[in-house]
A protein has these predicted regions:
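Conserved AMP-binding A3 loop
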Residues: 53-58, 188-215
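Conserved pre-ATP/AMP-binding loop-to-beta segment of ANL
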Residues: 38-41, 155, 160-161, 171-192, ...
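Conserved structural elements of the adenylate-forming
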Residues: 61-66, 171, 203-224, 244, ...
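Conserved AMP-binding/adenylation subdomain of ANL enzymes
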Residues: 211-233, 237-280, 295
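AMP-binding/adenylate-forming catalytic core of the ANL superfamily
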Residues: 113, 119-120, 130-133, 282, ...
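Structural core segment of the AMP-binding/adenylate-forming
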Residues: 73-74, 97, 101-169, 182
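Gly/Ser/Thr-rich phosphate-binding loop
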Residues: 252, 279-284, 293-354, 367
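Conserved ATP/PPi-binding loop(s) of AMP-dependent carboxylate-activating enzymes
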Residues: 362-365, 376-408, 446
Length: 476
C-alpha cells in the first residue's frame, strides 16, 4: 500500500513491499470480502437494454466455489492451464477466482481472436480446459480436432456439441471450497504477448503480480480507494490492462466493477454509460478516449461523476491531455508497462506528477531507467531503452516453455522493454518508439510474424511482410 504522503520523493523513500509468505489471488479478491462484508457489491452488470444486475461478494464467492468444484470434478489440478474466452460478465471473475483457488493457471484469451490465434495459444499453453460463451462455438469447432491437450470445454451460457453447460454443472456442485495454499511465486496466470520474431509468447505470472500492481493502482487512480469509487474500462478483461489495471485490483479493494459488453465499441454510448452508472474511475486506452472525444456532444459531460482516469498502451499525447483537463475537469494520468512488467511508470496529477507529452515518473516500489546497449544507465536527455530492475513483484516469472527468450529479455538485472525513451532532468520519462517491428494499434501490440503466417497459409500468397502504417486515431 502507498504511504499517505503528498510528496512524491518522500513517498518513494517511504515505500516498502510487504509480500506475505503465502498469497492467493482468489481469496484476496473475493473470500476475505465475502467473510467480512458479504452483501458488498462486487460486480454491476448492465445491458444496452437498460437492465442492471448487482452481484455481491457473497454471490461471487459461492459461484466461484461451484466453478472450482466443477473444474476439480473434471480433473483440473494444481498447475493445470485453464483458458478463458469470456466477455465482461459476472462469470469472468468467478472463473478467474475459481482457477486461482484451485492453484491452476488462468490463460485469458481475447474475444477478438480468430481460430488461428486461439489454436496456437490453446496448444502452446497445454490448456486442459476452456471456459467460453456459446457465440465462440463456431471458432472452436473449426479447430477442435487440432487441440492436442484440451479435454473439456465449458460454456457459461448454454451448451453445444462437445460443450458442457457450466452453469448446469456448477448447480450440482457445492458452494464451499477450500482454496489451495499458494505462494507468491506460484504460477497464477499466463497472458500472451506478441514480439517481433516468432509466435506469441506466454508471459507467466505468479500470484504476487496482483500485489505488484497495488501501488500503481493507488497512484494512477489518485489514492484509491475513496468513498463511492466505482471502476470501469472498455478494454477486454483478457488483456493485462483490463484484468490487472481494473478487474482484479478493484475487487481487491472491495470496490464494484462495471461489466458491460460492447460487441463493437460505441464511443457515444460510452458517455451515456458513464453518466447512467456513476462510474468514478476509468481506464480508457488512448484510441477509445480519442473516439469518445470525437463523439462528445454539447452536454456530454452532464451527469458524469468521474474522479480519475488512467490511460496507456500507446501515447496519450498533449492534445488529449489538455482536452480532458479543460472539458472533463479530470487530468488523464498516463501509465506505462508491458504484459511482462506492468504499471511501472505513470502520472499522478493529485500530487503534481503530471506533464502533458510525458508518461510520468517511476511508480513507488519500482526502479526504472533508460539504459544503453551495454546495460549502463543513460544520463538525462540521452536516448536508450526503457528498462525495469529485478527483483520486482510485478515482473513475470518467465516465458512459458521459452527459456532462451526469457534470458534475452534481460541485460543483467534489467528487463528490456524494447521501447525507446528518455528521462529529463526532472525525472519525467517520455516514450518515442520501438526498437523492433511490433505494431501498436489501438493499444494492442501485434507481432508481424503471426499475421504473416496467416497470410502465407493462403494458397495464393507465396511471401508476405507486415509493417505498421501510421494512423492518427489508432497509432498504427
Amino acid at each position: 500500500m502507498l504511504p499517505e504522503l503528498n510528496d512524491y520523493s518522500a513517498m518513494r523513500r517511504a515505500f516498502r513491499w510487504q509480500i506475505p509468505a503465502q498469497f492467493n489471488i482468489g481469496t484476496a479478491v473475493c473470500t476475505r470480502w465475502a467473510q467480512t462484508d458479504p452483501q458488498r457489491t462486487a460486480i454491476v452488470s448492465k445491458t444496452r437494454q437498460g437492465s442492471t444486475h448487482n452481484v455481491s461478494f457473497d454471490q461471487l464467492e459461492r459461484l466461484s466455489n461451484q466453478f472450482a468444484n466443477t473444474l476439480a470434478a473434471h480433473g483440473v489440478r494444481r498447475g493445470d492451464r485453464v483458458a478463458l474466452l469470456l466477455p465482461q460478465s459476472m462469470e469472468t471473475p468467478a472463473a478467474h477466482i475459481a482457477i486461482y483457488k484451485l492453484g491452476a493457471v488462468a490463460v485469458p484469451l481475447a474475444m477478438l481472436f480468430g481460430p488461428d490465434a486461439l489454436e496456437y495459444r490453446l496448444n502452446n499453453s497445454d490448456a486442459v480446459a476452456l471456459i467460453m460463451t456459446t457465440d465462440s462455438s463456431g471458432k472452436l469447432a473449426s479447430i477442435r480436432d487440432r487441440l492436442t491437450t484440451l479435454r473439456f470445454v465449458f460454456a457459461t451460457d448454454g451448451t453445444g456439441p462437445d460443450i458442457l453447460d457450466l452453469q448446469n454443472e456448477a448447480g450440482k456442485a457445492s458452494d464451499r471450497f477450500c482454496a489451495e495454499d499458494t505462494f507468491p511465486d506460484d504460477p497464477a496466470m499466463m497472458i500472451y504477448t506478441s514480439g517481433t520474431t516468432g509466435p506469441p509468447k506466454g508471459a507467466l505470472h505468479g500470484h504476487k503480480v496482483l500485489l505488484g500492481h497495488i501501488p500503481g493502482i493507488q497512484f494512477g487512480y489518485e489514492f484509491l480507494p475513496q468513498p463511492d469509487d466505482f471502476m470501469w474500462t472498455p478494454s477486454d478483461w483478457a488483456w493485462a490492462g483490463g484484468l490487472l489495471n481494473v478487474l482484479l485490483p478493484s475487487l481487491y479493494f472491495g470496490l464494484p466493477v462495471l461489466a458491460y459488453r460492447f460487441d463493437k465499441f460505441d464511443p457515444e454510448y460510452a458517455w451515456t454509460l458513464l453518466a447512467e452508472t456513476g462510474v468514478r474511475n476509468a481506464f480508457i486506452p488512448p484510441t477509445a478516449l480519442k473516439m469518445m472525444r470525437a463523439a462528445a456532444g454539447d452536454d456530454f459531460a452532464k451527469g458524469l461523476k468521474l474522479r480519475s482516469i488512467i490511460s496507456g498502451g500507446e501515447a496519450v499525447g498533449r492534445q488529449l491531455q489538455e482536452w480532458s483537463k479543460d472539458q472533463l475537469g479530470v487530468r488523464v494520468n498516463e501509465i506505462y508497462g508491458q504484459t511482462e512488467c506492468n504499471l511501472v511508470l505513470q502520472s499522478c496529477a493529485a500530487i503534481g506528477i503530471w506533464r502533458p507529452g510525458a508518461i510520468g515518473k517511476p511508480t513507488p516500489g519500482h526502479e526504472v531507467a533508460v539504459i544503453g546497449k551495454d546495460g549502463a544507465v543513460m544520463a538525462p536527455g540521452e536516448a536508450g531503452t526503457i528498462a525495469i530492475k529485478r527483483p520486482d513483484p510485478v515482473m513475470f516469472l518467465g516465458y512459458w516453455k521459452n527459456e532462451q527468450a526469457t534470458r534475452d529479455k534481460f541485460i543483467g538485472d534489467w528487463l528490456l522493454t524494447g521501447d525507446q525513451g528518455i528521462v529529463d532532468d526532472d525525472g519525467y520519462f517520455s516514450f518515442f518508439g520501438r526498437d523492433d517491428d511490433v505494431i501498436t494499434s489501438a493499444g494492442f501490440r501485434i507481432g508481424p510474424t503471426e499475421i504473416e503466417d496467416c497470410l502465407i497459409s493462403h494458397p495464393a500468397v507465396k511471401l508476405a511482410a507486415v509493417i505498421g502504417k501510421p494512423d492518427e486515431l489508432r497509432t498504427e
